[in-house]
Design a protein with these regions (language model features):
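Aromatic (Trp/Tyr) and acidic
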Residues: 1-87, 91, 119-143, 183-204, ...
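Asp-box/WD-like beta-propeller blade repeats and closely related beta-sheet repeat scaffolds
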Residues: 115-126, 133, 149-184, 190
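Helix-capping and short linker residues that terminate individual alpha-solenoid repeat units
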Residues: 85, 101-105, 144, 160-164, ...
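C-terminal beta-rich recognition modules with glycine/proline-rich loops and embedded aromatic residues
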Residues: 209, 280, 342-350, 355-442, ...
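C-terminal beta-strand-rich structural cap/linker in extracellular carbohydrate-active enzymes
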Residues: 451-454, 484-501, 505
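Solenoidal tandem-repeat scaffolds enriched in leucines and small polar residues
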Residues: 163-236, 243-248, 254
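Helix-terminus loop motifs that line ligand-binding clefts
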Residues: 37, 73, 87-120, 150, ...
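Solvent-exposed beta-strand/loop surfaces of large extracellular or lumenal domains
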Residues: 461-486, 505-508
Length: 623
């Protein structure tokens, strides 16, 4: 079995979560997961295939991802219901599982398509089954729902009977004529099949997983059209530094690559074979060091491509961010290294939550660094990925590091931790993080106890200090854990000060401002005069020039309160609007266009995108 340096807290260990993360968590609960029409539609998609009078008119025959929706909903709802102590949502989960089980066919098939349109599946059904299995297994694990486990087992049997290495079975990667999709992402099914073996104790699933893994190289070589994932040998080469990510497969799909890495992580957790762990950690480290944006997002319109094809206006998808966060959490659990929690923080407080509408009702599929986010739409892979991670956000705040209590991320919150050989411990954060780096941590063991308290210090918090009660402040190591070992008394308190300086990411012509954990953006619709007449825009972010020195960006910035409904603080910066392009045919017409004008601009954390929307720019010109 795998070695772990950090153990996650259970969702029921989270007593409360507030602040910005809490607002987004509660919005996801109220306006997404508890939307009665949305959840109902997800399960009805599965039920319709068993109703012959509906099969010709109302079953789903397109190639893409709607069959996954119920799985991601179950996953998110189970975590959320336990964190929020929401009995009504727990009841709904049980009802959905019962209806899913009733919709399952005799051979174990659990999808949304009638038999005559499957060859062996419709479109992306292995991708869809990945999430259906995950949702069922989460409910079996967290809620002890045995019907969920049995339904997952029957689906798992269908999968390992239909695909595999034996005569008469389909390859996981191959040409499936007429199914409407290239069939190139099948290796991703590895993770939930391994997890199914863990939970059932049935060794057939692990044996199937390792046997099919041994065929990845051959299957991918025989199917060059697949650009979703890559062969096993190439994964080893990437982890070792012998290939770059865009060389794994031309136009490789970021999300599927991450999902396949999660499968190798599950194999390591089950078998303890170091090779699997080395591939995952090597890949995560290279992606973090070389391919993740400073907002935490990654890829260009879903794909890892050579760097010359990246641009701030390129689309950045939610899906690979959600599996990236899961990979980072896995690396954090294995190693206990603060860097992985820092990367989770980077993505959550910037690009990931920038894609969520502030009311929690939906997510943008794509959210570029500059331009405008794609208008949220009906159920799709990305808004379901968003609510899946949002449903478990609070579980990333705390953990046990070397069996000692640890604070991994900062947000107003409270959790009860049960560490081996220690009394029950309540940790409560009072803070306005990420707007402020001032945190009061209440440390409240049920009785006096000696233990080490681990506090993660972010890499940007130079000069961080911690003060226990009235003791002298102690300096804290930047980018690592501060470990405070002492006898803790009920009612103890630690004051943690994390300095937030204003820095920038800049080249010779463009820059982006950063304050502490937050990347900032210029939102046209958040300016005092957005220059909008009905649906006509007279000004865009690319018209803005900031008057800043990138060597000392903080000197040209003034902090002020943001509007009440927005994450702050706002940054007020002096700059100018460039002269308009001479678009009219005559000099007289062009003379009436606005001339260059100096003025103040208001920049806000990028995470406000789902509240402000419209045109924005993370990168702005400067002089």
């Amino acid at each position: 079995m795998a070695r772990r340096s950090i153990s996650s807290v259970l969702p029921q260990d989270i007593a409360s979560v507030g602040g910005f993360l809490g607002q987004r968590f509660q919005a996801n609960l109220k306006n997404r997961l508890k939307d009665p029409l949305l959840g109902e539609e997800f399960v009805r998609l599965h039920e319709r295939k068993r109703q012959p009078f509906l099969q010709w008119t109302r079953t789903y025959d397109d190639w893409f991802w709607l069959g996954e929706q119920v799985g991601k909903w179950l996953d998110a709802a189970a975590y959320t219901a336990l964190i929020a102590d929401d009995q009504a949502l727990l009841n709904k989960i049980n009802q959905v599982i019962e209806r899913l089980a009733q919709s399952q066919e005799e051979d174990g098939y659990l999808g949304i398509t009638v038999r005559w349109h499957r060859n062996p599946v419709r479109g992306m059904e292995l991708y869809e089954m990945y999430y259906v299995l995950h949702g069922l297994l989460v409910c079996a694990d967290l809620l002890d729902n045995q019907l969920a486990l049995e339904t997952a087992r029957r689906l798992g049997d269908y999968i390992i009977r239909t695909w595999g290495t034996e005569s008469g079975q389909f390859p996981l990667v191959g040409r499936f004529p007429g199914n409407g999709h290239d069939g190139g992402e099948g290796t991703l099914i590895l993770e939930p099949i391994v997890l199914l073996g863990q939970q059932t104790g049935d060794e057939r699933y692990l044996a199937w997983s390792e046997k099919t893994l041994g065929m990845w190289d051959k299957w991918l070589a025989a199917y060059p059209e697949s650009t979703h994932t890559c062969d096993y040998t190439s994964m080893k080469q990437f982890a070792a530094g012998d290939k770059d990510v865009y060389e794994l497969r031309e136009n490789i799909h970021a999300h599927t690559f991450h999902m396949t890495l999660l499968g190798l992580a599950a194999l390591y957790n089950t078998t303890g074979k170091e090779e699997y762990r080395d591939i995952v950690l090597g890949s995560v480290d290279r992606l973090a060091d070389e391919w993740v944006f400073f907002t935490g997002g990654m890829s260009s319109t879903e794909r890892y491509v050579p760097r010359r094809f990246y641009h701030p206006r390129n689309q950045i998808e939610v899906c690979p961010q959600h599996t990236w966060i899961l990979l980072l959490d896995q690396a954090l659990q294995w190693t206990g290294q603060a860097r992985y929690a820092a990367e989770i923080e980077r993505d959550l407080f910037n690009h990931f939550l920038a894609a969520q509408l502030a009311d929690g009702s939906n997510w943008s599929y794509f959210t570029p660094l500059n331009g405008h986010a794609q208008e949220p739409m009906g159920p799709n892979c990305c808004n379901a990925a968003g609510h899946r991670i949002a449903g478990r956000l609070p579980t990333y705040l705390y953990g046990l590091r070397g069996n000692a209590p640890a604070v991994l991320l900062y947000s107003a919150s409270e959790a009860v931790l049960d560490a081996p050989d220690l009394p029950s411990l309540t940790l409560r954060q009072e803070t306005n993080f990420p707007s402020s780096g001032e945190i009061i941590l209440h440390v409240d063991p049920a009785q006096p106890a000696d233990f080490a308290l681990h506090l993660r210090i972010p890499p940007y918090a130079d000069g961080a200090t911690a003060q226990i009660g009235s003791d002298q402040p102690i300096s804290a190591p930047t980018g690592d854990f501060l470990v405070i070992e002492r006898e803790w008394q009920p009612g103890d308190m630690v004051k943690l000060s994390l300095p937030f300086s204003v820095t920038c990411q800049a080249n010779d012509t463009q820059l982006a401002l950063v304050r502490g954990p937050l990347v900032y953006a210029y939102f046209q619709d958040a300016q005092p005069d957005p220059v909008v007449f009905h649906y006509h825009r007279g000004q865009y972010p690319e018209d803005v020039n900031l008057h800043l020195d990138p060597a000392q960006p903080g000197q040209g910035v003034r902090e002020e309160a943001a509007a009440e409904e927005l994450l702050g603080p706002a940054l007020r910066v002096r700059g100018s609007i460039q002269t308009r392009a001479p678009i009219f045919a005559t000099a007289e017409g062009n003379a009436q266009l606005p001339a260059q004008e100096e003025k103040d601009f208001v920049l806000l954390p990028f995470a406000n995108q789902g509240a402000v929307q419209g045109e924005y720019g993370v990168f702005l010109k400067y002089r």
